[in-house]
Amino acid sequence: KKLLKNFVFEMPYAHFLGIDATHKNNKLVTILPYSSSLIGNPMLPALHGGVTASFLEISAVLELYWGVISTNWRFSSDQLNRTSSTGSIFHGQIPKTIDFTIDYLRPGQPKDAYAEAEIKRAGRRYASVYVEAWQEDRKKLYAQASGHFLMPNNNE
């Protein structure tokens, strides 16, 4: 769990948005807590599309960290206790986005949002991830995305 919290802490924008992650039913679920500052259209009101896109992309990267990087890389207990003020456990190496396609299915309501990502393919250099986001009802998605990522080299 500490490693998961460190993953979020390593991404400044995720930290800024207040994104958190937890395990539910043996899956990683990313949480975007509602804040009025996330509203893009105050007339509806609806979550800003850029916030939704960022949330989905961060969810994909967290899934890659959790599903691939954390199981293939070995971290000492000293590394796991580091914070960004004392140095990154990842040395700035995060998966780099090659492309990311978002489908906005309905407006995001002024409520907490949840996302779950699934790694479709992960190799040494490339990974493909699919992400779904919902709010109150897991079956009523408000956005979905697919992305391709260049994986970091853990030998550097």
List each language-model region with its residue ranges.
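Terminal targeting signals and extreme-terminal segments of soluble enzymes
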Residues: 1-156
